[in-house]
Amino acid sequence: MAIFARELIGKDVVDSHNETLGKITDIVFDVQSGSITTIIVTLEGDLNPNMLPWDGESGKVMIPVDDVSRFSNKIHLNK
């Protein structure tokens, strides 16, 4: 199944407890394979990126695609 990057930008990202973390604002691709490696998520208002298990700053976190459990109407994480 194929999915376009434009379909992912702006989607809500939820953790394993179905709590909203924020929205996808950018995507990182592997140039060789064309596969998504990382999603960049702009966090909801008061979430502190330093309290999350991913690298982040300035209200954004970089989440490896390996931490994504599924893509649907929301992006579901396995953490």
Model-identified regions with their sequence ranges:
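Peripheral interaction segments used for macromolecular assembly
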Residues: 1-79
